[in-house]
């Protein structure tokens, strides 16, 4: 494994104690009418979460507070402390005076006792202590976190036994003789709404019952597949209870349309819950409500469960590590041109492009320069489910049936009708203080204002959802939004996903630029995130391509065999099934990641098959093998199980269906209700296709074992930072202060 540390800038922590004040006055005339009820407001405009205040003290001209506050400061900014003395009143609080103090005067680790004069007679006494932040709440590294490394070791021992069990009748030379020979296997599920979720449920049943699931180290999902993974891994009886039983629960849940949850009494409950989130200072969009709908449909008894709580399913290596994904996108830029992949696991959330990760409980909190300045509760799993599948909140008009369109139009065609600025907006000017009015109003007046604001916001949300759907044409209603956890960081350079970039042979220019669907695809993927934007937008990863390959192509994970299942929509059942895989290949090559050559002409030579195998070129020791399953009804029409023909009219009728060709197909990407027959057909089809190719999977596992044996240092990365050609994002600022030693 490599030990690559991504450079980041240090910050200062200011500890400020408001000690006391002397001779607080409202002026000669004001003092005759009333004795002040003073409190102090503090502000450092150059830092987030910059407004803080003491309690007020009644009728005291010499108040003593002794209250301590903290600010995270950028030492390269001209930071100025603004101190405002206030008088609390029943209606509107009164400003008594303001003083400023330049924080550049402070020296690290030296306490300063500061006296500020306000007016002619009033003094405010402060204690200021400046510290260097010795650690941050973000982890800056390309390596896997310690928890995942420990998981991999524990899981490897279990996988070794499981592979021996799966291949028990094989020649011993095909079995791993040591943990080093155990291949790392990843299972992938694509997006595709409930079609992907139901199809993946059949896949997982087959993999679980055949023993292949126990041989996998990772399960990665995107959009609809993440919904199934969320339901499976959050189930209290999983993994002791397998997908076979759990899928019956899923069938019952999807037999009712989740839109029935849009009854006024439910919506009112959702929106009021979201007001609490908004009033605490977190951004709220329609993705939050969509996540509630998906959660109430799939995990109704587990709405409070968190991503981090899924660690209990994997800590002993008893199940593959689940990986989920979304995209960070920019305003006014197509997701196909620019997108940063965000990965989620029960251990960490982050972006490998920047080597920046955090614990799941911190995602959504306010950060500055790598440190949390305001922490919120961990988001519930259903919120993340809404983010991971947010294409459907973006296209909710279509889901509702509000927009008239042809049933054959694809999600891509629908999204082309929506300009990027309607999905996301520029948040650089967002007012982070929108819910923090500080001391300008009395407590009673503030409470009344909050009640009116809540009522107004709830009414607007209800009207938008139940009425004219204006919510869907504004940036507020489109994409998920969270506080920017990279706010204030210094992106001088970034490390490529691949530690071999710039050292191995360069991909040919022709391979670099060949378009799969659009000449502009991935054109701007080397650009950096905007570290000045206070919030970032996070959307469905399927908006760039519909397979979560970036998660498991990280060289640190050392994946040998990828078993991917693509449930993406195609124009017809007979259409070539490689579009998403070709996009994944192009993305990998642009990031210098090992990826087998995808020969799309295999479709012309061999026709439509249940799965295709793509192997690395001879001598390529670090490239994974890919088994790519597609959504196709071929042998299932005639066989109810591998080798078992259909022998009754009822059986034959059950297996005789198309997925994309039928005009009234229940398998539309936008269908959120599956009757039992539609569910069983798709579920059983993908279970059959998987079981029908178990021998293909076994052969690939054997090949991976032999490759590991022949290349014991496979995927071992020991390159130093100086050996890697960094991609320059921004010119280095020579004025950046060096961290003191």
From Swiss-Prot:
Residues reported to bind Ca(2+) 1: 34-35, 37, 59
Keyword Metal-binding recorded: yes
GO terms for biological process, alphabetical: glycerophospholipid catabolic process; inflammatory response to wounding; ovarian follicle development; regulation of G1/S transition of mitotic cell cycle; response to wounding
Domain C2: 1-116
PTM info: Activated by phosphorylation on a serine residue.
Enzyme class, first EC level, given as a word: hydrolase
Location of the region described as Disordered in the Swiss-Prot/TrEMBL record: 406-453
PANTHER family attached to this UniProt entry: CYTOSOLIC PHOSPHOLIPASE A2
Protein's recorded name: Cytosolic phospholipase A2
Biological source species: Danio rerio
